Amino acid sequence: MSSSDRVTVADVMSSPLETISKDATVEEAAERMRELDINALVVPTNPRAIVSSTDVLDAVAEGRNVADLTVSDVMTEDVETVSPDLYMEEVAAMMETYGIKHLPVVDDDYVGMISSTDVTATLS
């Protein structure tokens, strides 16, 4: 396969990017993900962060009250990111290496999100 035939992150990423404040409740984050039928939201902080459905489920499984928790209590910080011009095979390798399912796409600023579902659908 020539490089011109290869699929890049920009070809597949979800955009516009959905975000949520670090001060929102975890319950609000869960409701937003359900409404949008997505599994992760970017939290516009420095360092970069996301909150995923797994973060929410972990909090519930630990017996924590998600109505009282804020996104900053459960979010994943210092997340790996990818650039829009990265090839999907490289994204698959990153996800496998780091054991992650969502990668924010960054081109100076957030521009989208790529998920393991996107990778599987593209490479299968």
Mark where each language-model region is:
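Tandem CBS (Cystathionine beta-synthase) repeat/Bateman regulatory domains
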Residues: 1-124
